[in-house]
């Protein structure tokens, strides 16, 4: 009898985006890689903070422009509770100011929505613990 090979657990991903269809598209992209597992969806920044604390994902995909609190504020709050959190900011903006604000908030990386399909999985694998 052979010993079972220890397969690494999947990378647990939380999606925080207020556009339901875009969130579903993100999940479809992530489903193409067996190493990634979506563990929750948040529709606003406040819900993202609550879910991040309760499900403790490996990586959080955080939209910047969301209701209640934006992605920058949600990132700051999550980092206060979970300093080790790996958060990738997602946005349609290529603004240098937004990139700087994302880093200041504690984001591990930044992916523009026009490059999601090409870069998202690589970005997750790069920042995941």
Residue ranges and their predicted role:
Residues 93-94:
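Short, conserved "switch-loop" micro-motifs in signal-transduction and mechanochemical regulators
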């Amino acid at each position: 009898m052979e010993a079972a090979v220890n397969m690494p657990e999947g990378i647990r991903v939380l999606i925080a985006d207020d556009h339901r269809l875009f969130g579903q598209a993100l999940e479809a992209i992530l489903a193409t890689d067996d190493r990634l597992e979506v563990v929750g969806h948040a529709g606003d920044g406040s819900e993202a903070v609550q879910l991040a604390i309760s499900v403790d994902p490996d990586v959080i995909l955080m939209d910047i422009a969301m209701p209640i609190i934006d992605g920058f504020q949600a990132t700051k709050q999550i980092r206060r509770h979970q300093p080790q959190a790996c958060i990738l900011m997602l946005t349609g903006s290529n603004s240098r100011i937004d990139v700087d604000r994302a880093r200041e908030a504690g984001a591990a990386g930044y992916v523009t929505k026009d490059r999601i399909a090409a870069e998202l999985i690589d970005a997750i694998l790069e920042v995941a613990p």
